[in-house]
């Protein structure tokens, strides 16, 4: 997105930009932090056009606006309008938000405090948005759709051969039924709105004490000098049991935190963070939880294979971590 177009879009919202700071590009969107002529820090987001994205934007913002109105530091709207940009090739949607301070962290920077705060933030978010009336998709349906196409992907004989010859791996074929059963069982549990993407890129940390946000008396997610200053990207929000959210974040932490044991990560995230520091309490079957964690890890493994040449995967730290964890969990076998 060229800077002239970005400025024109900002002008459409009735704002004169004084300085555009940077752009952050993700899978779904491009995010521009800028300061207005009046001195306000704002965030312009361009959303990638894909099936259902407009409804997804509206649903996710409905959830985050509720969380903000109840005192949580989450991304929230500056302007309620959605701008549509079209040309002969594509359609892009743009929306304007308040800017949240803080930074995401590198995977090797995770400490016990970071993980505990993540657990607390998720717990508080769950209790805050529990009664939302937003019409969200079911988390189980989202996962079953994923399950269908990864099953088809790995059923392809040429893919099976490439996995064996280029990656020296075999897939435990029984896991596909096990994953489906875990998703279906979790679907029968009590449900509520979830974030479903509380991973490193969507959590903003600050290493100094923050001023209270306008809706809270004090910073609410803080341990000594470390604070979670914001949660962003609610686009994957869905309805389901909290086990889905916890399993997603735990799986991601397993791959990120090579210097911490799985038991320590579980303790920091769920026992110390979610249950003790947070305002919700998670009680679930550990075997079911582990099944969902393995599913999320396997889905991440699939994405590595789908989007990268197999020959270069052994140079990817997170692929190697995910592969080794899946071998330990008996999902993959070295051949």
Which role fits each region the language model picked out?
Residues 27-35, 43-44, 180-244:
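Active-site acidic catalytic loop and adjacent metal/ATP-binding pocket
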Residues 13-35:
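ATP-binding glycine-rich phosphate-binding loop
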Residues 299-335:
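ATP/Mg2+ or Mg2+-diphosphate-binding catalytic cores
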Residues 94-108, 156-159, 294-312:
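A glycine-centered beta->alpha junction motif in the catalytic cores
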Residues 46-92, 113-116:
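A conserved alpha-helical element in kinase catalytic cores
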Residues 243-279, 294-310:
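Active-site activation/catalytic loop segments of kinase-like enzymes and analogous catalytic loops
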Residues 281-293:
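All-alpha amphipathic helical-bundle segments outside canonical DNA-binding/catalytic cores
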Residues 108-167, 191:
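A cross-family kinase active-site recognition segment
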């Amino acid at each position: 997105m060229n800077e002239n177009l970005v400025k024109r879009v900002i002008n459409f919202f009735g704002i004169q930009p004084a300085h555009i700071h940077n752009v952050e590009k993700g899978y779904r969107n491009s995010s521009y932090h800028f300061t207005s002529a009046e001195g306000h820090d704002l965030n312009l987001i361009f959303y990638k056009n894909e099936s259902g994205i407009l409804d997804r934007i509206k649903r996710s913002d409905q959830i985050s606006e509720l969380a903000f109105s109840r005192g949580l530091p989450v991304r929230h709207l500056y302007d309620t309008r959605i701008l549509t940009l079209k040309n002969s090739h594509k359609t892009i949607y743009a929306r304007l938000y308040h800017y949240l301070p803080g930074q995401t962290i590198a995977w090797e920077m995770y400490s016990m405090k970071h993980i505990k705060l993540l657990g607390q933030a998720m717990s508080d978010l769950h209790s805050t948005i529990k009664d939302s009336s937003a019409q969200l998709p079911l988390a189980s349906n989202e996962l079953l759709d994923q399950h269908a196409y990864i099953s088809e992907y790995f059923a392809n004989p040429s893919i099976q051969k490439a996995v064996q010859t280029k990656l020296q791996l075999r897939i435990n074929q029984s896991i596909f039924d096990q994953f489906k059963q875990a998703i279906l069982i979790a679907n029968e549990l009590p449900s509520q709105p979830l974030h479903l993407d509380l991973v490193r890129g969507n959590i903003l940390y600050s290493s100094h004490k923050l001023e209270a946000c306008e809706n809270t008396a004090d910073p609410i997610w803080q341990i000594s000098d470390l604070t979670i200053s914001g949660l962003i990207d609610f686009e994957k929000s869905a309805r389901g049991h909290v086990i889905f959210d916890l399993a997603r974040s735990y799986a991601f932490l397993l791959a990120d935190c090579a210097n911490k044991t799985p038991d320590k990560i579980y303790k920091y995230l769920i026992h110390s963070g979610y249950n003790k520091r947070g305002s919700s309490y998670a009680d679930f079957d550990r075997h079911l939880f582990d099944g969902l964690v393995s599913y999320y890890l396997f889905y991440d493994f699939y994405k590595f294979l789908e989007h990268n040449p197999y020959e270069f995967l052994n140079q990817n730290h997170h692929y190697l971590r995910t592969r080794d964890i899946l071998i330990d969990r008996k999902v993959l076998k070295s051949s």
